Structures are given as C-alpha cells and as structure tokens.
Amino acid sequence: MNGVWSKERAWEWYNSRTWLRGCNFMGSDCANRIDQWQELGFEQRLETANRELALAAETGFNSIRIILEFLVWDKEHDGFMQRLDRYLDTAWKHGISAMIVFGNDCMPPKNEFWKPLQLGEQKYDWGYHGGRKFSQHQQFGGMGYHVMDDPAVFARHEQWVREIISTYKNDPRVIIWDLYNEPGNSHRESVTMPHVRRFFEIAREIAPIQPVTSALWRNIASPDQDEINTFLLENSDIISYHSYGTYEQNIRLIKLLKSHGRPVINTEWLARMTHNTVEQMFPLFYLEKIGCWNWGFVAGLYQTYEPWNGVWQQWEQGGARDVDFKVWFHDLYRFNLHPYDPNEIALIRKYCRLADEDHALGL
C-alpha cells in the first residue's frame, strides 16, 4: 500500500515531541459511547469531561484515546461534527491531544440478548464491566456481529472515516489516527480484514500529517502467523499494541516490536487484577519511551474497574485462579475524583515530569 511513512519520518515525528502518555477516556457520567457523543445530555457531559480532563492534565497526561460512535455521526451528523470539535477544543485547552479511533471489533454475537444500538437514554446495569450484564466483555461461542458486514452500511462507514480524517488531517489537536480497535476480536478473524484494509486505503488517500496505526492485540509473539498482524505491521506508520499481560510479557513484546525499527506505543494497558500494574508498567514505558494510554480514568457508569464478565465466567468454570479480585481492574480515580491509590498517581506524576525534563534536554 502506498503512503506508509518511512522509518526516518516516523522517528522524526515521534522524537519531535515529549513522551506521549494518557488514558482511554470517557467521562464518568457516560454509560457508553453513545452517551459520550449524542446530543442528549451532551452539555452536562462536556462539563464533566472538562473537569476530568483538567485532572488528567494535573496528573501529567498529555493525550487521550477516544473511540467514536458511528451511529451518532450517522443519525446526528452536523451536531456530531460540532460536538467532536468542541471535545477536541476542551482537551486541547488542557494541553491534551486526542488519538481518534474508528472501527471496533469488540462486539457481541447477534443472539437472543443482542439489541440494536439506539440514540436516547442509555440504560446500564451496576456491577458489570462496560455497564451491561450481557456485553462484548464476556465469552461467546459465536462470531461478534457488526453492522459493517452489510455492504450498504459499510459504505457509510467509509464516508465517516473519510470525512473526519479530511476535516482534521492538519489539526494538531489530533495526534494519531488509530483506524481500527482490535481487528479480528470477538471471533471475527479474517471477516474484518477488508474493513481494516479499506480504512487504511482511505487514510493513505488523504495523507494526514498525523501517523496512522492500528494495534496488534493477540498472537503478537508470532505475528507472521496472523494475517491481520502482518498487515498492521506492514502498513502502520508507528507500531501500536495492546497488552494486559505481566511486566515480563511486556518486556518480551516491546523487544520484539522494536525490532521492526519503528516507534512503538501501547494504546491499552492496566489490569491490576491480572498483574499489569501502574507500579511496574508506567516506569517500563517511560524507560523504553513507549507512548502509553491506560484503560479508564475516573470510575463511572461504564464501570471498567470491574473485571471483564469473561473473567467471572472463567472463575466459575474453575479457571482464573491467579486473578486478584480484591483490586480494581482499570481506572485511576474514584467517583469523587480522589485517586484509587495515591501512590499510583504520585508515581505517574514523577515519571511524567522526568519525561518532560528529558525532552527539554534533547534526550
């Protein structure tokens, strides 16, 4: 595919800025991404986001990863575009850039529990990761259903990606284009490959000033045996990956991914329950200069401090015996904006400060 940045250009872009660090962000009063982007309740939720983004900046973060919602763009187009711009403005005034994500393969199958997404008041269940009792965060036998599998609907998704990248292709408020979240997840495997390929083609046609990527998230240790991983490694300007694995596992992954000669970032991490902790991972990312975005910020309606429903299923079936159920899974702050663990926040602030000092010295 034409247009992939040279390694030299990727490193020039990466080294021209301080260490990128932040979180996957959704305001604590959002039940899901429809809540985050739809007109209903947006003014109040933007106030919440403003308050929490100020806290993110105070913590030392300089970037957020945000996943867009196609349905809102499709049904409330003009309003969505205005709201997205206001969201970017709100983050930017706190010195925070945004990584924008389009596609997402974390989808439940179309079974008896499946319901189509709708605008309006969003229901949620307490005590469940993602705020729903039946969600994509549990184990299913069938393939996850995506509306993009309908060619007519996919054509609209192409327009969505094209319009937003074209609108912000020269905008410093957008730091990275993360075109597809976890392609192949939910047993979708190669079904997703045409969608991923097309999103990359669109981005290359537009040629934004920001790098283009999509994260490896499984089989990373043997990427040549995975069609999607091979494509992502060959077509991403900077290499991104997800890992909720241990410190030792991440050391091996970082070494492997760095061998490709491009900057490496981690766009999803932090799983205290499975021993992926702030105390170990954040200093590692600093030392290796791996840009990093942990999952979650302020605990809220989306409830990602709870374990994935699939972890409970494993435990009930006799597995997951190494999981520490006494600690939060994701998120850094409590509902009242106090830290989940003040020691974590102190450590984050320390390494953010060190990174900025390094950059000022040209290190």
Annotate each PLM feature.
Residues I345-L363:
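Catalytic domains of carbohydrate-active enzymes that cleave complex glycans
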Residues M1-S236, H242, Y247, S259-H260, ...:
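Active-site mouth of glycoside hydrolases
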Residues Q303-E306:
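C-terminal beta-signal and adjacent terminal beta-strands/loops
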Residues N266-T267, C292-G296:
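Conserved active-site loop/cleft motifs that coordinate metal ions or position small ligands
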